[in-house]
Amino acid sequence: MSVFIYLVKGREKSLLRRHPWIFSKGIERVEGNPVDGDTVEIYANDGRWLARGAWSGSSQIRARVWTFDKEETVDLDFFLRRLKYAQESRDPLIKRQGLTGYRLCAAESDGLPGLTIDSYADFLVCQILSAGAEFQRELITQALRTLYPECSIYERSDVAVRKKEGLKERTGVIHGETPTEPVVIEENGVKILVDIRNGHKTGFYLDQRDNRQAVSKYTSAKRVLNCFSYTGGFGIYALKGGAKEVVNVDLSQTALDMARQNAELNGLDISNTQFIRHDVFKLLREYREKGEKFDVIVLDPPKFAESKAQLLGACRGYKDINMLAFQLLAPGGVLLTYSCSGLMEQSLFQKIVADAALDAGRDAQILELLSQASDHPIGTAYPEGFYLKGLVVRAR
């Protein structure tokens, strides 16, 4: 039986601008008894049809739009079309950069709310993050098996956001083989080991690809400090850029061991490379007390803010760590600093970094504004898709 949602008067404006979310406070009434994931018809208060979406009774985002086309039904062909378009739109990038690891589907920005898919060689790794995507899991799997018959499909839906949708975390094989060993991918001629089963996110930070490449132009004959190094991506590019020394710092010994393997996999000389297991904040303070200086510092911390309530604390954390970095930079040194918190707006992040430089007593210049790689597109009607912000800053 069809379910009909009628919005509060005036709340249709965001949908007319093709934003894919309907919040609980924007709904005046529901006709029918939807279960989580059900496809629902969305109407303006005056009875105009607006969109077709997926119901989520547990979430503040009560419905996510599948389509704004009244003639388009949500079936296997729908998912085949969306996924095929997502692949074709990325094919030029894949060919240009020689990629065997890339984001195939970027959820709302690719018209598939709550569905993230990363491709690692012969594995497709899915994160199913919404009630709608969960409800359509079998159709999504069928579409992927049709389009990628040679690929195994693995799920990494072990993320806290599923709880907001009334879903439990889940991982495991959906189809094909289990990735028992790390998978080797390539980007820009660099080989990288990816632990699909146990690594961060779906195994690797594909969104930082362009920014990893950007670091290499600043590292020739330089001393480089790579903070929150994970499996060493920025450090590898720094070495390929001619760095005379690279210090990788992370709390995970497993990640550091893989960082070493990644450097060796690329045939790099690591005689002047360190892999240090330490808390970054504490180590930077220790370096400051010792008077250590670096020519290039990379700050790629984990997400500091998961909610608006955490944003103030996140601002303090970002300011503190960037101030420490400025204090460790040699004259003319370059800081590459990032925030992956979607709630952190570009202007706010830029202000935090500027304040950090001021508190460190350093004059600084922004050389580059950086963001996520282009296989992580940002829908023009979905600004929430712009989550990764980066700055390249030179300190005098």
UniProtKB/Swiss-Prot annotation:
GO terms for molecular function: RNA binding; rRNA (cytosine) methyltransferase activity. InterPro entries: PUA, PUA-like_sf, PUA_sf, RLMI, RlmI-like_PUA, SAM-dep_methyl-trfase, SAM-dependent_MTases_sf. It is found in: Cytoplasm. It catalyses: cytidine(1962) in 23S rRNA + S-adenosyl-L-methionine = 5-methylcytidine(1962) in 23S rRNA + S-adenosyl-L-homocysteine + H(+). Its EC number is 2.1.1.191. It comes from the Bacteria. Its main location: cytoplasm. Pfam families: Methyltrans_SAM (PF10672), PUA_3 (PF17785). Belongs to the methyltransferase superfamily. RlmI family. HAMAP family: 23SrRNA_methyltr_I (MF_01857). Specifically methylates the cytosine at position 1962 (m5C1962) of 23S rRNA. This is Ribosomal RNA large subunit methyltransferase I. It comes from Aeromonas salmonicida (strain A449). The gene is rlmI.
